[in-house]
């Protein structure tokens, strides 16, 4: 989708009346039903047993970039803030922590594609077959950001993406998505698609992973998070759930 035309920031240009909240709610639902592979774990041992007792998620700690360089990090923050721009009610991708989420993911197993089969041959497949590149996610970002910076400095009189006005940033992103902007040494459309997917994931992920800071996305769409008990609400229909969302780390928003 062309982000600036769909109006993630405010109202949709192509679909009048679709609000930012409605569009992001649709995005959240699509992420839940995306083609992510499922996995199961056999739990063995004697009782008592408690969920996640052996491998609780490690919360992302604030601090300097882990994978990105300083210039790459600044570019990613500018990019995610155009994919999900701020509005008076909700922070944009940068303040929601999407760039931090992506940085930490690229520094870990996801960035190295440890759970994917990455041996050849590598040939172009159909869209239904997904990514067929030899590049890991981390390598695609490094390659794509370098190519994007080179393109911007060549086309915009030495300016980086960060230095461009918002309308030029939006035009460039739309061109990447439509495959109308060609980056030297990188697949611009594939880079855009990877970036958009990871930005959406960071916006809606549990805050323990670095994005969705202060559960802003969950609060916006009314998602209760990881609450374990809804027995008091089973028979209560068409009522807004009043309690704040809860992270898998146990913290309420």
Please report, for each region that a protein language model flagged, where it lies by residue.
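N-terminal secretory signal peptides
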Residues: 1-18, 29
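Long, amphipathic alpha-helical surface segments
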Residues: 181-253
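Terminal targeting/low-complexity segments that flank the catalytic cores of oxidoreductases
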Residues: 3-4, 40-60, 64, 231-253
């Amino acid at each position: 989708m062309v982000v600036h035309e769909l109006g993630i920031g405010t109202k949709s240009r192509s679909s009048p009346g679709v609000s930012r909240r409605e569009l992001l709610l649709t995005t959240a639902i699509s992420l839940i039903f995306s083609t992510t592979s499922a996995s199961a774990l056999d739990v063995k041992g004697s009782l008592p047993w408690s969920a996640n007792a052996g491998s609780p998620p490690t919360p992302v700690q604030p601090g300097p970039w882990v994978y990105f360089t300083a210039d790459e990090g600044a570019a990613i923050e500018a990019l995610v803030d155009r994919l999900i721009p701020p509005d008076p009610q909700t922070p944009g991708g940068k303040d929601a922590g999407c760039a931090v989420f992506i940085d930490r993911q690229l520094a870990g197993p996801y960035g190295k594609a440890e759970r994917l089969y990455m041996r050849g041959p590598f040939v172009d497949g159909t869209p239904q077959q997904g990514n067929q590149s030899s590049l890991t996610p981390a390598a695609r970002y490094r390659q794509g950001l370098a190519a994007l910076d080179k393109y911007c400095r060549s086309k915009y009189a030495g300016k980086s993406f960060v230095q461009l006005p918002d309308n030029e940033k939006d035009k460039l992103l739309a061109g990447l998505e439509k495959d109308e902007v060609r980056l030297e040494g990188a697949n611009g459309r594939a880079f855009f698609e990877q970036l958009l997917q990871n930005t959406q994931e960071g916006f809606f992920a549990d805050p323990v992973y670095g994005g969705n800071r202060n559960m802003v996305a969950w609060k916006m769409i009314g998602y209760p998070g990881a609450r374990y008990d809804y027995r008091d609400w089973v028979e209560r229909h068409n009522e807004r759930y009043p309690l704040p969302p809860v992270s898998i780390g146990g913290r309420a928003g």
